[in-house]
Amino acid sequence: MNLIISTMLLILTNQYSIETPNYKLVKKYKNFEIRDYEEMIVAHTKIKRTFRESNSTGFRRIANYIFGGNDKSMEIAMTAPVLTKFPSDINSNIFEVSFVMPKEHNLKSLPSPDLETVSISERQLGRVAVFKFGGWATENRTKYYIDQLINSLKKERIDAVGDIMVAQYNSPWVMPPFRKNEIIIAIK
């Protein structure tokens, strides 16, 4: 029993020690919050598959990059969250998976990826609405929470204007009750 409790505490404390992007909390609503994100650098890749397959393939491609699959064989610290951008065309199935690079790096200090399918670029999320949820971020659950956030924005007369992403903060072995995910939508 002590081993189980110790393991759970280790998992929970580890998930909060991973670097995450900086943002300013603008306003908190009942079901969501508004944030202003600072510019960040991301490693990203596009995948034309299902949501689940895209997350898996995208994760592996970028993990290859940060674990030394680059022109300097340099290892780069893992950060959170892993971002999956939904296709802007509802009939498309091209997802973009991104890892945020540690703040200590800039575009010049980061090595070039070995894989041509991985790119490094600056990303400006800007002002976004964020809806938090736990459990597994499956495609059905994610779409459900996207709808929840869009409906909440409409009630508050806030216009969604850009990309829709799901942010997953935890490693795969974190149990569903302890998982942290967010739906992120760019707003005016």
Model-derived segments and spans:
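A solvent-exposed interaction/effector surface
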Residues: 2-188
